[in-house]
Amino acid sequence: LAAHQEIQKLALLHPAGELTQAQVEAAVLNVARYDVFKLSESVLAGQTGRVQRMLDGLQAEGEAEVLVHWALAEDIRALKRVKDAMNAGRPLPMALRENRIWGPKERLFERILPKASDAALARLLQSAHIVDGIVKGLKVPDWPQDGWQALQRLALQLCRLTSAAR
């Protein structure tokens, strides 16, 4: 029923001709259920606006803060592991394979890692550690006390790193 209603909505919004993927995405974006894995890809792609909408959607849908944190922190840890392997002399493709990074994330990592500094990744790892405490109820100076606000700050820090790598 929901899919049928979306098709009817698309017919009303765009009555003539073939639809592009962008038109379909724009029409259904606000009703789409979000998941943490798509959030992860959007963060790694540096899509700041989309990331903010997805975080708002995940919060509204009642997603657990710790699960969202896990997804973000896992990406940060993986970036750091692959970067460390590269620093140890491993070629990027081998480091990605060894860390089980493939599919869409592989391409995103290939774009990010050559330009990401060790210091930036260390700062992100520290931020992820702080947010881990916040989503579990700890209060940290200079950080939002609300878990979702802290998650947004962490996601935007990672977005800035990935945007700089473009």
Each predicted region: which residue ranges?
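Small-residue-rich helix-loop
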Residues: P15-R123, S163
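Non-catalytic interfacial helical region
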Residues: L1-E41, G133-P141, A150-R166
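Short, basic/aromatic recognition patches that contact phosphate-bearing ligands
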Residues: A128
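Short active-site loop/helix that positions an aromatic residue
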Residues: Q145
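Hydrophobic packing residues in well-ordered alpha-helices of helical domains and bundles
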Residues: A3, H69, L121, W148-L151
